[in-house]
Amino acid sequence: MEIFTLFTDPHIGTRRVANTTRESSKLLQEALYSAALEAADGPGKSICLGDLFDRSTNPEGVIVQGFAVAGRCRWVLAGNHDCANREGVVTSLDALQEMGCPIISPPNLSAPYFFADGPLYFVPHHASQQLFEQAMLDAAAHAGRERAGRASVLMLHCNYDQPFATEDDTLNLSPAIAQKLLESFDYIFLGHEHKPSTQFDGRVVILGNTHPTSFADISDKFSYQLEITDYEITLRRDRIWSKDERFASVMFGQELPDLRGVQFIDVIGAADEAVAVADFMQQVWENAPDALAVRNSVSVAGVSVADDEAEKPVVEDLRTRISRELDGTDLADLFSELAKEVAV
């Protein structure tokens, strides 16, 4: 019997501005790293199902954190946040692979790829939906031949049943393909989506991430223990983050509850003046020693002032996006200078 601990989407290096202070943003980064370390230290051999990093390239300190987590793992699957989808780009995950970490990623961007390790099958992030689907079908065909009558599982990093999510930076597993894959596999485990759920009577398991990165993905979080023999699979999950304990809604103007241990606080209600809301928000921060983010969802004079910047899609020009992606790297200053020259 082999034992594996499954976890996904630690998003090491995440930086949040909305709903945070400079100090709490750093604390959130540390919380994400700590959650990943704890998950990787679970029973048996640990496996990360993607998005070890929040961005494909990272400062040295973040890469060191990724090395500490990946070095504890049996395998680390490449997710969409880990990949650049451009030939010749060396990502942080590539760097870890060069340093000896067990990374599963496509050898090139133009061919389907799966990896098998006994009963475990992996399909990492691909550059297109077409390649991704072919890789899954190839894995199923291989398992059907080599694992017929014996236990096997498939591990992916993608959305489930979101047909619009088929671009190069996000992929999809449809129910129709899942049903076909389940002819060869006992279970399918998915990284990528941050809230846990199951499909096909529990045989398709969406793990959910290890720790909330913002208000958008708050839910109970779990790690999963997988016990595999030649002919039997046992799965259990352990709660590693509790929404009831770590999240709270607070009514504006009312006496504050005990906020010790609460990491995410949503301030709700209505007010006549914005100044009063600002004062109350400050009071919340002062009485929440463990807060990582406090959101203002109070409406003032009928106009919502909720700050959901981190969770809303942002439309930006190419130069702004490149600057944001390079922020914190050695290329940021160089790009800024080149952009100024082109503008002139």
Which sequence ranges carry the predicted segments?
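Conserved beta-strand elements of the Class I
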Residues: 5, 119-121, 224
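N-terminal active-site segment of His-dependent metallophosphoesterases
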Residues: 1-65, 135, 140-150, 334, ...
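A conserved active-site cap/scaffold subdomain adjacent to cofactor or substrate pockets
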Residues: 187, 191-253
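Short histidine/acidic/glycine/proline-rich micro-motifs that form metal-
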Residues: 52-54, 80-84, 211-212, 270-272
